[in-house]
């Protein structure tokens, strides 16, 4: 009798153990699928880069990209990366395959960013910007190198509706003039601090979802809005998102870690 009870008990335990293992596997699989889906899900509507002409570079002296390019030729003009409806579908499919970004051309990276809004793709564009900057420094009269560097101003910011993305660490004034947004964002680096000062809104303010790509070593809870630390900061696709009704001269800032390069990876 005891053997029968023991056998029945052991069988029951085994059944529950199997169910627990299966349940855990189901949950783990669901989590993996959810993470993968999130990483591969394109934006509902693709972004558009703001025109390079809307980015006024204010970096002083020889570090000013526009001044360096104009010394090569005053006739150079930035070339924009855009998407058609057909190419947007193609790049959505490419994004779903999660290509090796290190092997992608700059044009491909730019369009992948427009369909995904992913911060790690913007980081790859920033590395390309630095590479082009180095090429022009090594060949300061090279027209092709100057054109390539000038084109990177078209990657500084992007928008869709009331979403505005600030992607590259360029000291500049970004003049936003789209059907849904009209404002100015001053991106300033001074004394180890990065500031974003917003203005140009109507008197009553305006709704704006501001997406900021933070540098390595800066945590979202280290960002301050109008002098107060952000509470429960929101992260989407690697960007810090500040979604609110903005008024003129409001300001975000964070301090850079010591001995860290801006947006270092």
Predicted regions span which residues?
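Aromatic (Trp/Tyr) and acidic
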Residues: 40-214
């Amino acid at each position: 009798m005891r053997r029968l009870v023991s056998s029945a008990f052991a069988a029951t335990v085994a059944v529950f153990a199997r169910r627990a293992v299966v349940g855990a596997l189901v949950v783990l699989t669901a989590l993996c699928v959810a993470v993968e889906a999130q990483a591969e899900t394109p934006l509902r509507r693709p972004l558009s880069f703001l025109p390079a002409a809307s980015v006024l570079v204010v970096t002083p002296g020889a570090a000013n990209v526009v001044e360096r390019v104009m010394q090569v030729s005053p006739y150079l003009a930035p070339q924009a990366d855009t998407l058609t409806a057909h190419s947007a579908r193609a790049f959505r499919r490419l994004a779903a395959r999660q290509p090796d970004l290190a092997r992608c051309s700059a044009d491909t990276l730019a369009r992948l960013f427009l369909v995904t809004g992913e911060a790690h793709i913007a980081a790859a564009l920033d590395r390309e910007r630095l590479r082009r900057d180095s090429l022009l420094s090594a060949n300061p009269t090279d027209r092709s190198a100057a054109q390539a560097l000038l084109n990177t101003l078209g990657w500084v910011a992007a928008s869709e509706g009331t979403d505005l993305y600030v992607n590259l660490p360029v000291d500049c004034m970004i003049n936003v003039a789209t059907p849904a947004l009209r404002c100015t964002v001053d991106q300033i680096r001074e004394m180890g601090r990065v500031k974003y000062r917003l203005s140009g809104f109507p008197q009553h303010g305006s709704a704006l979802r501001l997406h900021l790509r933070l540098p390595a070593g800066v945590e979202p809870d280290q960002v301050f809005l109008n002098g107060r630390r952000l509470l429960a900061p929101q992260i989407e696709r690697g960007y810090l998102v500040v979604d609110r009704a903005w008024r003129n001269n409001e300001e975000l800032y964070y301090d850079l870690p010591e001995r860290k390069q801006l947006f270092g990876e």
